[in-house]
Amino acid sequence: MTTLDSNNNTGGVITYIGSSGSSPNRTSPESLYSDSSNGSFQSLTQGCPTYFPPSPTGSLTQDPARSFGSIPPSLGDDGSPSSSSSSSSSSSSSFYNGSPPGGLQVALEDGNRVSPSKSTSNITKLNGMVLLCKVCGDVASGFHYGVHACEGCKGFFRRSIQQNIQYKRCLKNENCSIVRINRNRCQQCRFKKCLSVGMSRDAVRFGRIPKREKQRMLAEMQSAMNLANNQLSSQCPLETPPTQHPTPGPMGPSPPPAPAPSPLVGFSQFPQQLTPPRSPSPEPTVEDVISQVARAHREIFTYAHDKLGTSPGNFNANHASGNRPATTPHRWESQGCPPAPNDNIMAAQRHNEALNSLRQASSSYPPPWPPGATHHSCHQPNSNGHRLCPTHVYPAPEGEAPVNSPRQGNSKNVLLACPMNMYPHGRSGRTVQEIWEDFSMSFTPAVREVVEFAKHIPGFRDLSQHDQVTLLKAGTFEVLMVRFASLFNVKDQTVMFLSRTTYSLQELGAMGMGDLLNAMFDFSEKLNSLALTEEELGLFTAVVLVSADRSGMENSASVEQLQETLLRALRALVLKNRPSETSRFTKLLLKLPDLRTLNNMHSEKLLSFRVDAQ
């Protein structure tokens, strides 16, 4: 039984969904993360830590069973927030002396929030697992008219049968997709969906779920868990990196190595990654905050040459000599990556399959690799346990710096080691939902670096572990959006993935991503127009992550204090770099509500794909 979170719509992180959507034959990260299911699923996480993506809303409420997935607050039949949602205002930062810059107060308080104390009472669970409405996919409030349904669909069906309402004929041949965000648009199709899933006046009953039905539902959940277990266990031997010895890094001595960490990490593993709260340290000075955050951003959020364990000169020399990477397995074996002579062929096939699936929308595509580019696929972990995507050497044009290259060197060739999967690992004949999921999955390896960056924010580890996880779950998508804003070419209306493959806005819009991509382009244009330095970008990223108004915080006062410290440092740095542009800091802060809006749009887009895949 697939589970979802009925939390607020104040934002969250990237959620990666299965192609089966909310089919009862498959499980979801949300159900596997609940307290009661952890016991039966413990065998998965012990031998092979798996990536369970974070919740789009990102709030870690008092109920652990609702830690994953997202649904913005339930709406009534008239589109207004239902009784299960309540609005709460975020506290104003004392940094603004009670009056933040224009628009920021509204931006940080936009959207309705679900009070943890109220929302948990209206959620139906089975052994700790949240159940979904059979009609629209919202969180079920109980067993109504024969099926698990939300309050909105229960009331809609009750009015329909009691008043014998004859709804207007559907304009789309009665083929409307009924999801939470559009369930009020076509009432005829909604009533038809109610009947098709089994809602009936004769099915009204009182009391608890019968034992026989409860056992059947538990059996479905267990079979879904076993299926996920089998799939992950078959992948586990291929994903386990070699044990590495600690080596002192630029940020100080490395901690003792963890026993063979998996390249993919889930938010259920955060308590093992994050340090327990320590005694409050003396408040650092503004200069210390700027230097520490900038250094962490530079050394963690970089496409650094040293992450591959080889210098750019040596790498380029190997390619200049005409040696194919596939014919030099000793170079990769020395770094813990087994020789794979067919990696290039398989990688090219997967990439071409993904392109062929997208070419149906348009026939004008750039070549998969730029002329002269050399490619090798080796998903190897670096010294920090990060999973690196294939490396590429791109010749820069004569007299020009490489486009979108995070670092500019003296050499004409630039070594790019990105923390993202460079292309979807798909198959031919995929649906739009599957292609969208593949693109979302391309962000997976970057999540680990967000965790690592957070640990180096001064004062972050002083927070409780609960608040650390809550901030990470809620802010990871926004951090990644800031980080990859440079990949959006506003002038040409294209998106360049880190494989150097460029997709036009029109092509991706044909897949149903138009509104979300337009908002991403607008945000990228605004952010890039500020021309932030590396230090400013690092501090702004920290401010985005440490937001005191996230729902589910245990000690919001401590988070707010840390946020004020980061804001003071960011303001001092911005005014120091450009003292004449006094409004630059305010413009930068006004990007926070834009990020929150993007977060909400991304959450609803993934939710609609999940329900459509039923």
Curated annotation (Swiss-Prot):
Cytoplasm as UniProt keyword: yes
Residue positions, PTM Phosphothreonine: T275
S-S bridge residues: none
Tissue: Expressed in all tissues and cell lines examined. Expressed at high levels in some squamous carcinoma cell lines.
Annotated stretches, region: Modulating: 1-129
Record PTM N6-acetyllysine, positions in chain: K192, K193, K591
Binding site for heme: C418, H602
Subunit details: Binds DNA as a monomer or a homodimer. Interacts with C1D, NR2E3, SP1 and ZNHIT1. Interacts with OPHN1 (via C-terminus). Interacts with PER2; the interaction associates PER2 to BMAL1 promoter region. Interacts with CRY1. Interacts with CCAR2. Interacts with SIAH2. Interacts with FBXW7 and CDK1. Interacts with HUWE1. Interacts with NR0B2. Interacts with NFIL3. Interacts (via domain NR LBD) with HSP90AA1 and HSP90AB1.
Composition bias, Pro residues: 239-262
Phosphoserine: residues carrying this PTM: S55, S59
Organism: Ovis aries (Sheep)
Any GO MF annotation of the entry: zinc ion binding
Chain residue ranges for the region called Crucial for activation of GJA1: 49-285
Biological role: Transcriptional repressor which coordinates circadian rhythm and metabolic pathways in a heme-dependent manner. Integral component of the complex transcription machinery that governs circadian rhythmicity and forms a critical negative limb of the circadian clock by directly repressing the expression of core clock components BMAL1, CLOCK and CRY1. Also regulates genes involved in metabolic functions, including lipid and bile acid metabolism, adipogenesis, gluconeogenesis and the macrophage inflammatory response.
Zn-finger segments (NR C4-type): 133-153, 170-194
Protein name in the entry: Nuclear receptor subfamily 1 group D member 1
Region (Required for phosphorylation by CSNK1E and cytoplasmic localization): 1-70
This protein's domain notes: Composed of three domains: a modulating N-terminal domain, a DNA-binding domain and a C-terminal ligand-binding domain.
Feature: compositional bias, Low complexity: 69-103
Main localization category: nucleus
Keywords for this protein: Acetylation, Activator, Biological rhythms, Cell projection, Cytoplasm, Differentiation, DNA-binding, Heme, Iron, Metal-binding, Nucleus, Phosphoprotein, Receptor, Repressor, Synapse, Transcription, Transcription regulation, Ubl conjugation, Zinc, Zinc-finger
Compositionally biased spans, kind Polar residues: 1-48
Gene Ontology terms describing biological process: cell differentiation; cellular response to interleukin-1; cellular response to tumor necrosis factor; cholesterol homeostasis; circadian regulation of gene expression; circadian temperature homeostasis; glycogen biosynthetic process; hormone-mediated signaling pathway
Region entry Disordered, spans: 1-120, 233-286
Compartment list: Nucleus; Cytoplasm; Cell projection, Dendrite; Cell projection, Dendritic spine
Segments forming domain NR LBD: 285-614
Gene name of the record: NR1D1
Entry's family note: Belongs to the nuclear hormone receptor family. NR1 subfamily.
